[in-house]
Amino acid sequence: MLLVMNCCYGQSVKSFSNADIQLFYEEKGKGPALYILTGGPGAPPQHPSYEIMDSLKATYTCVLLHQRGAGKSRHVPINEKTINIASYLKDIELLRQKRGDKQIMLLGISWGGLLAMNYSVLYPQHVSGLVLLGAAPPSYTLWNVLFDNQYTRRSISELDSMNMLQKIFSQKTDAELDSLKRADPLAKEVVAFKNFMAIHVRAMHYDRSKAAGNFEELFYGFNFQPIPYIDKEVMETRWDITSALKKLSIPVLILYGRQDDQGEATFFLQKQCLKNSEVRVIEKCGHIMWEDQPAEFYKILTSYLTKNP
């Protein structure tokens, strides 16, 4: 378990700063810059990013940002001043300036897709293209569809179990849970939270048996604290970039699984907004495409990116 909790990152970890916050990133490969923005917010950055970097290192300089609150940048204080969309976007721009890239291609996974789209709206002159992998919706209007879809995928017994487990771990704050799961993995609150998340993650797969594959790494590496802040910001500010996206002409790949729990309305809206986009759909596949249908996922991804460097 300690091996799972103490992640080893690549040898090329570098740092930069946004105000007084130090942030980290990794580089691999040679060629045009491809920035990889992972999900969450708060997800451990290495999977599937390392596999993607290995498959594209001959064509791109792959730049993996450890987003604030995740990976080696996990130390960032979690509050409304540090966890907001604008700060995440500023991090990307400061990283681009640090590296000196005039233009970048952005690959966004889930939440990372939201950042990729929003960054492109703010800095269109610096973006050569987008790859959106199961990207989050570009508008608050579809934000809660995810939760509704997940609810319908759970059995009554699963819902009962989640309610029971939540009563146990909700006695701790998110910050207390995050500290406790590393200090005392067998604490009752941690065990309850872990079992709760195991049920939650299953709804994100087409083949539920595959949810267990990287769950240990995901659970102990994931910092769940930033999520409520972003959910709150999106809904309270009525965050929506759909009109701005329609002004972009850059090439875009929209790739998603047919059974993604975000719902196809999310990806239809992306297609409506991004006029120069290509849509690819993987059948019998949920949100975690690289686990549900890895061969098809990497085939589509590498084929598109090696043709469009």
Feature locations, PLM:
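Catalytic active-site module of serine/aspartate enzymes centered on a nucleophile-bearing elbow/loop
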Residues: 277-309
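Short beta-strand/loop motif that positions the catalytic acidic residue
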Residues: 248, 254-256
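Conserved hydrolase catalytic core segment
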Residues: 102-146
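Flexible "cap/lid" loop of the alpha/beta hydrolase fold
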Residues: 131-180
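Conserved alpha/beta-hydrolase
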Residues: 57-74
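The serine-hydrolase catalytic nucleophile loop
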Residues: 41-53, 265
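Conserved acidic catalytic loop of the alpha/beta-hydrolase fold
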Residues: 86-104
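Short beta-strand element of the alpha/beta-hydrolase
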Residues: 32-40
